[in-house]
């Protein structure tokens, strides 16, 4: 049995048990050799559609690493920003009425490494419908400081910085990475949630409510197909997809669990226990994940629609990710 078939078996079992509607697994090596396997359905309500290799996925927080981290580090290389400079060097209006506010001291590097006091998440979409007003809310809110956690706010602010650096009002006005998009044809997309806020099954439009309300954000919103995700990973493996300094930074530890933008192996991490210390990875709430092992010269992406039609269900995604990673890295 090929590696792709063995590694796909845990996902196939969850699809057969109707815990996840469908998914795609892809593996790519540094020499460009790739394998992809697909099963299940892209949508089960209110209509039924089969999953294919060309299905578009809402990549959710993979946006943070595929798009935002890469663009921020490109801006560093171009001399447009400095990693240890505060965000106010680009966002001077951040907490502008409180010159001594702690938010004004937060740096780009701290946001990339989730080393700030921002909360994990905030229902920004509940504060209004106007995306410009919501941007002002994010910038002027007196955030309650807490222990450093993985925070969407860090990357929302990095997205606002990219808007300012590029002179656009919306992040989605910028071109995404090659092969990616900010939305997709619903007929070719994996459905996500039956959204009680937007009164419809989301398909081809962003699942994250804050990203939707902001009309584009640095923490979510990117869409892609399995081969585009594998192409991105291959570009990092062989050095063709980013500068040497950018690749070095995304591999450089900032803490026990994180590099610049990415996660690194720790006990219980989603990539499993068998990958090398030279692995980086990230997951997305919708059921996506990407891991790149620079030592072994291999990357793998697992894309599912595990939140369809609801997130309030034990899909088994956490155990699935680890099981797939362990199989891939034990061969």
Which stretches of residues belong to each language-model region?
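Active-site SXXK
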Residues: 8-12, 25, 31, 58-84, ...
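Short, P/G- and charge-enriched loop/turn segments at secondary-structure junctions
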Residues: 12-14, 56, 98-99, 275-280, ...
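Short, well-ordered beta-strand elements
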Residues: 35-37, 290, 297-306
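Short, surface-exposed loop or secondary-structure junction motifs
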Residues: 36, 43, 98-279
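Glycine-rich phosphate/pyrophosphate-binding beta-alpha loops
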Residues: 215-221, 279-291, 304-310
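Short, gly/Ser/Thr-rich active-site loops of penicillin-recognizing serine hydrolases
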Residues: 251-256, 267-269, 309-331
